[in-house]
């Protein structure tokens, strides 16, 4: 049993960018399209000639307004004038300006696969305007199993990493690492992991990316772990796990990496779980109550660990570290439109649960009198996503 992450909404689907893909001997790497039209010197020349972005407004005020225009309106907006064409002509220019002005809106990136063709594809939901967009395909030569790889993100930097995985129809793990930059709408191939692995634990702690355990060739379980420094792109080993183990779900809580293998049929043995503290570079066994009650996909909200149950029509629950137990939170169960498998992520006090066909449930969580509660809203996906099953999801800001 493995886990994932995703999202949904009914709307026209737009291209997030116009990147072209070129083929190298092993990988397809995105190449940006450039034109003299989008040169900064052209923008400077037009502004010096006194052509305003919006007549009657200072440029800084006008730009502050235009940077709020939804992406789906860019095609029509760029035909207004040359300066608007420079701003809306490429998503790289637009998002670079938004970053410069400090805009940080959330976008939900969902990776799923077609139940008809098995093709892996990323879909992106603008969480402000609830519109769907697309990004270039990951530059992988081999056909990859949609569940074996792991993705992590640096939300505030607008970057995402996809690591490891497994070649479809084989037990061959991968050491591949891909990086996606939202501002550039661009995938790059980065330094490989030390150990090829699939179905492993991954998480980001203090800006460092950790990978632990998982499956090697022939589904042999690993105990080795490693960490990536995104600033220099280098992986280095860290302490081995207490036991060889693949990961069912992972969470980062209080600066520690929590890893559970989940319940395995026929449920004769309690699931194993381990906790890694990067400050001491030590692993320890997870408490019994935490690992035995971990029966779904986790999110961390209000510095507490919440679970969306493995089963449909179940209520969320939250872990109490004082009593080492789980308790159900108030509010309705997951809406009936959301069917397994689930892809789960969170932002602020909201949890995003994407189900089959990319229908999305948004849960608003709050605390009252020491008891948590949730209220659900459903966002239906476009009909064209009717054959997509979610595998993973991340949230980036741009």
UniProtKB/Swiss-Prot annotation:
Residues 51-98 form the F-box domain. Kelch repeats lie at residues 106-152, 159-207, 209-255, 257-304, 305-346. InterPro entries: F-box-like_dom_sf, F-box_dom, Kelch-typ_b-propeller, Kelch_1. Keywords: Kelch repeat, Repeat. GO terms for cellular component: chloroplast. Pfam families: F-box, Kelch_1. This is F-box/kelch-repeat protein At1g30090. It comes from Arabidopsis thaliana.
């Amino acid at each position: 049993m493995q886990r994932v992450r995703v999202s949904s909404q009914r709307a026209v689907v737009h291209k997030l960018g116009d990147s072209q893909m070129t083929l190298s001997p092993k990988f397809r790497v995105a190449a940006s399209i450039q034109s003299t039209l989008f040169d900064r010197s052209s923008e400077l020349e037009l502004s010096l000639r006194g052509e305003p972005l919006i007549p009657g407004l200072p440029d800084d005020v006008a730009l502050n307004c235009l940077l709020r225009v939804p992406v789906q309106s860019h095609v029509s907006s760029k035909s207004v004038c040359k300066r608007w064409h420079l701003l809306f002509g490429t998503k790289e220019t637009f998002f670079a300006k938004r970053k410069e002005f400090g805009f940080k809106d959330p976008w939900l990136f969902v990776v799923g696969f077609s139940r008809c063709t098995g093709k892996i594809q990323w879909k992106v939901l603008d969480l402000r305007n609830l519109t769907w967009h697309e990004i270039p395909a990951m530059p992988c030569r081999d056909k990859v199993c949609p569940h074996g790889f792991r993705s992590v993100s640096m939300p505030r930097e607008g970057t995402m990493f996809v690591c490891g995985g497994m070649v479809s129809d084989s037990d061959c793990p991968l050491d591949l690492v891909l990086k996606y930059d939202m501002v550039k709408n661009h995938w790059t191939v980065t330094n490989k992991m030390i150990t090829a692995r699939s179905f492993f634990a991954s998480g980001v702690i203090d800006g460092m990316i950790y990978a632990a355990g998982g499956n090697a060739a022939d589904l042999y379980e690993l105990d080795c772990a490693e960490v990536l420094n995104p600033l220099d792109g280098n992986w280095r080993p860290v302490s081995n796990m207490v036991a060889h183990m693949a990961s069912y779900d992972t969470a980062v809580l209080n600066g520690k990496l929590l890893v559970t293998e989940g319940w395995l049929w026929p449920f004769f043995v309690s699931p194993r779980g381990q906790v890694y503290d990067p400050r001491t570079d030590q692993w320890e066994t997870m408490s019994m109550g935490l690992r035995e009650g971990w029966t779904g996909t986790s999110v961390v909200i209000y510095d507490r660990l919440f679970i969306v149950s493995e089963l449909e029509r179940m209520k969320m629950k939250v872990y109490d570290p004082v009593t080492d137990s789980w308790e159900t939170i108030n509010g309705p169960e997951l809406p009936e439109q959301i069917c397994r498998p689930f892809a789960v992520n969170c932002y602020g006090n909201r949890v995003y649960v994407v189900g089959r066909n990319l229908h999305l449930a948004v849960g608003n969580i709050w605390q009252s009198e020491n008891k948590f509660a949730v209220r659900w809203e459903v966002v239906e996906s476009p009909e064209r996503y009717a054959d997509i099953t979610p595998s993973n999801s991340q949230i980036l800001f741009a």
